[in-house]
């Protein structure tokens, strides 16, 4: 998702695959889905933005389980856009969920956290950065 897009609150806006070896599965999904990869520098390593073959549109991320993703199990992680991440994280715990990664910045894009719902499924909440008009 680019920083110029304004996501609709409550929508699934992105998905990342978080795994120990991003290069291995980058190549797997490039072969299976025809995606092309664009590296995203993360300091000493790169994660990957995966793009659709026909349009070049960004469709997913393939990320190392390091940095902000350290400690996450291998999984596809969907991001749900919320208006107020602090309020949504509080509601998560009030309703029986768990905060796995507390709210933290995601570069200039906004703020995210990772939650586990009462059934054990994991998702991320994302509050986009405020843009000046």
What are the residue ranges of the model-derived segments?
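Core segments of cupin and vicinal oxygen chelate
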Residues: 6-9, 13-57, 94
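Vicinal oxygen chelate
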Residues: 21-23, 54-55, 78-119
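Conserved beta-strand and immediately adjacent loop positions that scaffold enzyme active sites
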Residues: 14, 47, 77, 112, ...
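Residue-level "edge-of-site" marker
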Residues: 42-43, 105-106, 133
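Conserved short beta-strand elements that form part of the metal-binding/catalytic scaffold
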Residues: 2, 35-73, 118, 122-129
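N-terminal beta-strand motif that seeds the catalytic metal site of vicinal oxygen chelate
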Residues: 1-26, 75-80, 126-133
């Amino acid at each position: 998702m680019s920083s110029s897009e304004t996501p609709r609150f409550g929508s699934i806006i992105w998905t990342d695959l978080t795994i120990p070896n991003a290069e291995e599965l980058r190549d797997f999904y490039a072969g299976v889905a025809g995606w092309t990869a664009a590296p995203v520098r993360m300091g000493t390593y790169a994660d990957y933005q995966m793009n659709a073959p026909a349009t070049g549109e960004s469709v997913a991320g393939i990320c190392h389980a390091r940095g902000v993703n350290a400690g996450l199990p291998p999984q596809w992680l969907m991001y749900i856009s919320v208006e107020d991440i602090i309020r949504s994280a509080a509601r998560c715990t009030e309703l029986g969920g768990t905060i796995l990664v507390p709210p933290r910045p995601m570069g200039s894009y906004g703020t995210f956290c990772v939650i586990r719902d009462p059934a054990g499924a994991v998702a991320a909440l994302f509050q986009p950065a405020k843009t000046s008009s």
